[in-house]
């Protein structure tokens, strides 16, 4: 028996006991949730508690839609080899994506839509690329405020949702 380091001992145990007799187990690694994940989870819970439904939309949009809803100065982040020209650019804002959801629902006569999305926006300035975590809210039609209390959405409903979320986050 040649045992000079720890690996030699482990090898001998495997040889004598039999490698096939040793049960394979994955190590238990404790994971801590990061600050951003905790905050995102809190925001999701709060928005859901306020009666909004979460949606997830494509991060790839058409390059014609990128500058449609913003006056910010940035270059779009285009894909070098897109699968389709309809989705050839990484979104800067979630507004074009949520607007497509609004159009889809409107075409199916679903006028009561109260959604939010938490996702990433991508940008380029010169040679620098970046991404930001963003939140976007879409409210149209009737807003459910409790049993028997539905009312048409107006500016003050959206303002109220925004203020309540900001108060909640401190």
Sequence positions of predicted segments:
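Extended, well-folded interaction surfaces typified by the phenylalanyl-tRNA synthetase beta subunit core
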Residues: 1-113
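Beta-strand scaffold of nucleotide-dependent catalytic cores
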Residues: 7, 118, 132
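Residues forming anionic-ligand binding surfaces in small-molecule and nucleic-acid pockets
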Residues: 16-27, 75-80, 121-149
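Short intrinsically disordered coil segments
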Residues: 94, 133, 150-154
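Generic detector of well-ordered alpha-helical segments enriched in charged/polar residues
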Residues: 95-99, 136, 163
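Regulatory modules associated with amino-acid/nitrogen control
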Residues: 96, 117-120, 126, 159-161
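Mobile "lid/hinge" segments at catalytic clefts and subdomain interfaces of large enzymes
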Residues: 105-109, 114, 123-126, 131
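N-terminal non-catalytic structural scaffold regions of very large proteins
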Residues: 139-170
């Amino acid at each position: 028996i040649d045992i000079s380091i720890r690996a030699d001992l482990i090898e001998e145990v495997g040889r004598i006991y039999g490698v096939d007799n040793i049960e394979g187990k994955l190590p238990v690694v404790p994971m801590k949730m990061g600050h951003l994940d905790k905050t995102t989870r809190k925001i999701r819970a709060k928005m859901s508690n306020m009666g909004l439904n979460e949606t997830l939309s494509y991060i790839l949009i058409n390059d014609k839609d990128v500058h449609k809803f913003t006056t910010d100065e940035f270059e779009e982040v285009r894909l070098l080899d897109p699968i389709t020209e309809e989705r050839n650019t990484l979104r800067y804002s979630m507004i074009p994506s949520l607007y497509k959801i609004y159009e889809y629902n409107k075409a199916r006569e679903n006028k009561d839509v109260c959604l939010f999305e938490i996702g990433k926006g991508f940008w380029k300035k010169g040679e620098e690329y970046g991404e930001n975590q963003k939140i976007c809210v879409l409210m149209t039609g009737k807003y459910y405020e409790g049993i028997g209390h539905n009312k048409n959405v107006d500016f003050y409903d959206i303002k109220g949702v925004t203020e309540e979320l900001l108060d909640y986050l401190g």
